[in-house]
């Protein structure tokens, strides 16, 4: 719960709501890690204003189909270098936010 609370503050939600959303996503994809889920949420927040197709659900669907985050972002309209940069930035943000709880 601790790392959900830290990330939740930056996503305008609660740790409980984020944890419940993760539990729901985990039912759809039992292989999904907490880190992948949190990164998908941060990616939506970072990218959706300019790339409306980038949603948490679209990223989770890509992961469930066996794609990497980068591959999923590319399929949603980002270039390879944009996808790598966005993935790396989101990972750094999740790591930082999780420590704030």
Question: Which positions does each model-derived feature cover?
Answer:
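Mature extracellular/secreted ectodomains of secretory-pathway proteins
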Residues: 1-101
